[in-house]
Amino acid sequence: MVVIRLARFGRKKRPFYRIVVTDSRKRRDSGWIESIGYYNPLTDPVTVKIDEERLNYWLGVGAKMSERVKKLSGK
């Protein structure tokens, strides 16, 4: 199953996340198909950017969003 979820990047205690499309059987940070945005919780206010066109494409072909990505995207 294809899922849209967060992949952690950055360094120790300074994380930022990419919003990626990946196979659900893969590990959190490995082997994603496409990066469609990012989330930076360390900025004030929090920075979230998602390519809505690509998000809608992947949802249209059957990808499922994680709970956190649903909250961030507002869908």
UniProtKB/Swiss-Prot annotation:
- What is the superkingdom listed in this entry's lineage? Bacteria
Specify whether Ribonucleoprotein is a keyword of the entry.
yes
Which organism encodes this protein? Answer: Nitratiruptor sp. (strain SB155-2)
* Entry keyword set: Ribonucleoprotein, Ribosomal protein
Which Pfam families is this protein grouped with?
A: Ribosomal_S16 (PF00886)
One GO cellular component this record assigns the protein to is:
cytoplasm
* UniProt-listed GO biological process terms: translation
Q: What is this protein called?
A: Small ribosomal subunit protein bS16
Q: What is the lineage of its organism?
A: Bacteria, Pseudomonadati, Campylobacterota, Epsilonproteobacteria, Nautiliales
- Enumerate the InterPro entries for this protein: Ribosomal_bS16, Ribosomal_bS16_CS, Ribosomal_bS16_dom_sf
Q: Which family does it belong to?
A: Belongs to the bacterial ribosomal protein bS16 family.
Q: Where do the TM regions start and end?
A: none
* Keyword Nucleotidyltransferase recorded: no
Signal peptide limits: none
Query: MF terms per GO, please?
Result: structural constituent of ribosome
